[in-house]
Amino acid sequence: MARVTVEDAVNQIGNRFDMILVAARRARQIAVQGKDPMVEEENDKPTVIALREIELGLVTADTLDADERQTVREREAAEIAAVAAIAEGRNAI
């Protein structure tokens, strides 16, 4: 079982409340969205991995925000391309 002290993570983020929000967002990315961990997994749960990433300075609220904005842009571009393909198909008929 991994033991993680959160003091380093708190120091990286600024306060424990924001650290919890950042860790939860990152753990959700790893567990649900299938994002790859930036540290060795070592059979740890996503929450522990998220805390280790925060401790090392690999994850901040800003990096998570930027990643989410990029994901939204990619999703919107895919939707626009799909609509354009459908419209072209209708025009060809």
UniProtKB/Swiss-Prot annotation:
<dbReference type="Pfam" id="PF01192">
    <property type="entry name" value="RNA_pol_Rpb6"/>
</dbReference>
<keyword id="KW-0808">Transferase</keyword>
<keyword id="KW-0804">Transcription</keyword>
<comment type="subunit">
    <text>The RNAP catalytic core consists of 2 alpha, 1 beta, 1 beta' and 1 omega subunit. When a sigma factor is associated with the core the holoenzyme is formed, which can initiate transcription.</text>
</comment>
<dbReference type="InterPro" id="IPR006110">
    <property type="entry name" value="Pol_omega/Rpo6/RPB6"/>
</dbReference>
<keyword id="KW-0548">Nucleotidyltransferase</keyword>
<comment type="function">
    <text>Promotes RNA polymerase assembly. Latches the N- and C-terminal regions of the beta' subunit thereby facilitating its interaction with the beta and alpha subunits.</text>
</comment>
<dbReference type="GO" id="GO:0000428">
    <property type="term" value="C:DNA-directed RNA polymerase complex"/>
</dbReference>
<dbReference type="GO" id="GO:0003677">
    <property type="term" value="F:DNA binding"/>
</dbReference>
<comment type="similarity">
    <text>Belongs to the RNA polymerase subunit omega family.</text>
</comment>
<dbReference type="InterPro" id="IPR036161">
    <property type="entry name" value="RPB6/omega-like_sf"/>
</dbReference>
<dbReference type="GO" id="GO:0006351">
    <property type="term" value="P:DNA-templated transcription"/>
</dbReference>
<dbReference type="GO" id="GO:0003899">
    <property type="term" value="F:DNA-directed RNA polymerase activity"/>
</dbReference>
<dbReference type="InterPro" id="IPR003716">
    <property type="entry name" value="DNA-dir_RNA_pol_omega"/>
</dbReference>
<protein>
    <recommendedName>
        <fullName>DNA-directed RNA polymerase subunit omega</fullName>
        <ecNumber>2.7.7.6</ecNumber>
    </recommendedName>
</protein>
<keyword id="KW-0240">DNA-directed RNA polymerase</keyword>
